[in-house]
Amino acid sequence: MALWGGRFTQAADQRFKQFNDSLRFDYRLAEQDIVGSVAWSKALVTVGVLTADEQRQLEEALNVLLEEVRANPQQILQSDAEDIHSWVEGKLIDKVGQLGKKLHTGRSRNDQVATDLKLWCKETVRELLTANRQLQSALVETAQANQDAVMPGYTHLQRAQPVTFAHWCLAYVEMLARDESRLQDTLKRLDVSPLGCGALAGTAYEIDREQLAGWLGFASATRNSLDSVSDRDHVLELLSDAAIGMVHLSRFAEDLIFFNSGEAGFVELSDRVTSGSSLMPQKKNPDALELIRGKCGRVQGALTGMMMTLKGLPLAYNKDMQEDKEGLFDALDTWLDCLHMAALVLDGIQVKRPRCQDAAQQGYANATELADYLVAKGVPFREAHHIVGEAVVEAIRQGKPLEALPLADLQKFSRVIGDDVYPILSLQSCLDKRAAKGGVSPLQVAQAINDAKARLAL
């Protein structure tokens, strides 16, 4: 039976019912709806709507229902109830009879669903934070194991300067740390309870909403009933967090797809996260990474869709807001799955050090070192830049790296170049000189690993 049937003399068209019903997706809020109902029953005792004995009966029945839901959540989908609130109330009435009809006193589905969704978001944020830190930890461990793996760093997808695989790993640790911070900030803002705001104007019962918020584990109660039932900022924030986080994971995936390619050959992925071809027996495809990259788009779409849904809504609640859940559920599920999968990809990855080092020695990645050498000899940087550019052209013409050019050839471009230039052009020197904080020098990378381990309690 619908919760609102008294006003109507005709039954809803079955096509409208299917269009209107939300149980097929909001069943995921069942546990939160039951927990919220237990807290509401306690609040009704404080204003004399329920006796202590009635509340006890309701709480016992709701707790039984909670265990039934946890044991078999799919049972909910066998119902033709309109939404999860209708389903919970119907099941409660089945268990306690007419007493169950008293529970909704002073409460609206508007503040009820807003509360349920915030409770769900809080739990999901904690899961995301755990998965995020697990991936950070996996990156730090991979970095620690590959501090000596020298590889080319890229700009414009062209070899630029030598870095290490460890330094690359730590770059993504930084991105994930920002994702973690955003989630923590979002959690602070959504940690306010809308329960007790009614449909839009507040409840007619003098319920202590701060006490009610505390029972539900919220930091406080919201301040304005109109805003409370129509606020979906936390949905937008979480979708934004997910969109940014998935961009980071997509870039991570793209880097490793390239590193794993035959053209680069810097890493080999485990068989556990790759697949083959139905036609070409030799193929070993990085499907896990490609799916992470591909799933980024659906999360961006969820954020854009929700913004467009909310942008023209008048205060307060509108049924448009029912559209908040499917996109949110899918986006956060996707982000969580991708965090877990990225960590799995790192488990068993093999870094091919000789190939990485060979690539780092190609492409004149030490050209900047020669320019810095000239600057140290008193040549203005802009002039040094031009000199080195000419030297690179000559090295390309001869088919040699810079460090293989004879001194006489180098001195054609600048007489200040001496025998002391050759140690400067080594890969190790290139790394050692980047010793400022955040640089790629072995000492800085080791310090960054230690700092990350301390922050993550590894």
Curated annotation (Swiss-Prot):
Pathway: Amino-acid biosynthesis; L-arginine biosynthesis; L-arginine from L-ornithine and carbamoyl phosphate: step 3/3
GO molecular function, one term: argininosuccinate lyase activity
SUPFAM superfamilies recorded: L-aspartase-like
Keyword Electron transport: no
EC class name: lyase
The keyword Repeat is assigned to this record: no
Matching InterPro entries: Arg_succ_lyase_C, Argininosuccinate_lyase, Fumarase/histidase_N, Fumarate_lyase_CS, Fumarate_lyase_fam, Fumarate_lyase_N, L-Aspartase-like
Pfam families xrefs: ASL_C2, Lyase_1
GO biological process terms, semicolon-separated: arginine biosynthetic process via ornithine; L-arginine biosynthetic process
Keywords in alphabetical order: Amino-acid biosynthesis, Arginine biosynthesis, Cytoplasm, Lyase
GO annotation, cellular component aspect: cytosol
Tree of life domain: Bacteria
Family to which the UniProt record says this protein belongs: Belongs to the lyase 1 family. Argininosuccinate lyase subfamily.
The name this protein goes by in its record: Argininosuccinate lyase
Name of the gene: argH
